[in-house]
Amino acid sequence: YVEPYRTDIRGLATYTIPRWDVQLAATWISVPGEYLEANFVADNAWIAAGPQPLGRALTGAAVATVNLIPPYTMFADRRNNVDFRVAKILHIAGMRTQFGVDIYNLMNTDVVTAYNQTFVPGGPWLAPTALQPARYARLSLEIAF
């Protein structure tokens, strides 16, 4: 199987408002979701008693992992993220100082970033195991001398 072409899209914009010496910046990223699997762990007991018995035990290992869906046919949701920054620029005693606030995940999306890809009949296949971090802010101070 050949992995299909999937596009990452990224953008960055910055602007300094000259009259107020305020710097604005935003980044945007759009990343396709990972491809999903349904990994089933078949052991010797299941192979011997399964719907189509193999008629012998597995050779060399007590278990075999089988992906039940063809590769690159199921994908997770695309992840979009916007980050924003605003900073005030001050010139004090010949030094350039910036007081800033960075806001990550501005739209507060809660996209699933990882799934349980182990298939167990009646089990938690595709249950989320990780989410994109929630919106948060960071204060910053930069002094250039």
Task: Tell where the protein language model's regions lie, with residue ranges.
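Repeat-solenoid scaffold signature
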Residues: 1-18
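Transmembrane beta-strands of outer-membrane beta-barrel pores
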Residues: 17-19, 28-34, 103-109, 145
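Extracytoplasmic gating/loop element in the C-terminal half of outer-membrane beta-barrel translocons
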Residues: 20-93, 98
